[in-house]
From Swiss-Prot:
Keywords, comma-separated and alphabetical: DNA-directed RNA polymerase, Nucleotidyltransferase, Transcription, Transferase
Record function comment: DNA-dependent RNA polymerase catalyzes the transcription of DNA into RNA using the four ribonucleoside triphosphates as substrates.
Native species: Dehalococcoides mccartyi (strain ATCC BAA-2266 / KCTC 15142 / 195) (Dehalococcoides ethenogenes (strain 195))
Listed EC numbers: 2.7.7.6
Reaction(s) the record says it catalyses: RNA(n) + a ribonucleoside 5'-triphosphate = RNA(n+1) + diphosphate
Entry's Gene Ontology molecular function annotations: DNA binding; DNA-directed RNA polymerase activity; protein dimerization activity
Tree of life domain: Bacteria
Name under which the protein is recorded: DNA-directed RNA polymerase subunit alpha
Domain comment, as recorded: The N-terminal domain is essential for RNAP assembly and basal transcription, whereas the C-terminal domain is involved in interaction with transcriptional regulators and with upstream promoter elements.
BP terms from Gene Ontology: DNA-templated transcription
Nuclease in keyword set: no
Amino acid sequence: MSDLAIPTISCTESDGKYGRFVVEPLEKGFGTTMGNSLRRILLSYLDGVAITRVRIDGIQHEFSALPKAKEDTLDFLLNLKNIRVESLSGLEGILYLKASGAKVVTAADIEPSNDFEVVNPELYLLTLDSDDAVLNVELEVELGRGYRAPESTENTPIGTIPVDAIFTPIRKVNFTTEPMHVGRETSLERLVLEVWTDGTIEPATAVSRSADILVKQFAALVSHNKVVAEVEASEPVKYAIPEEKYNMPIEQLDLSVRAVNCLRHAGITTVGEVINRGTKELLTLRNFGLKSLTELEDRLKTIGLSLNPEEELFEDAENSKKKNKGMDEA
């Protein structure tokens, strides 16, 4: 049986777009192994949202002149690519940008949507320099991962301009390893992982999802016979939840619109289905982060339920044993 050190992770700094994490203790060499793996997953394999096509009234292609604006169409498109969007519903769709008159146009001028949130509304897009200027733009928003080059086909309508899309929500990842000792053991090390995001995902959520991807990929390498034996030996544990609470629609929990949309997109419509998923599986849902999880846990507590009923049952059993033991001693 392996006697390798089992590490723990702690977040030592976080501001929504930046997170610093320390993983320790690790056997010598594991810091680089883990750091490299997490870095590659973070930068390349997390889902994100990006603008993929643009339609501008009066503009046929990217080399057309943009009337009554200081920027040309190419510069405008380059600025549009920097808009960072979070999908609240987990769906693709269209955003609309409308402006008129002489003004500085920013991402804040994009019309509000129930399905999307622009996380950098202060982003500069262009300047209209005439009082009679009118700008109408449609932005196609898609889900994906990594980077995708512009896609133009014979069926692309005239006036639709494809743009290269950067889906990854991660801007930068750094990691370092440091030597450490625990007691007399001096051959251990710690991993320091720094993550910068674009604001559409929290650093802690990004690290959690990346680790989950790695676990699922490595699970395929586990002995097939061992997996089958464990599955056959395990029996499902059922927890008694009143039927009226089990079948309660998630809307009755008074969750935020964002949390409800994330759950419904994953096919979760009742409180019972939420509890069946559990904490770990919920955190793998698209756009369902730690804030949504905390909100959900708080709402469940108000109706006397928990995302981890097995832990509560264990605690109740332990408390009961201690109580009975105290009575016996008395």
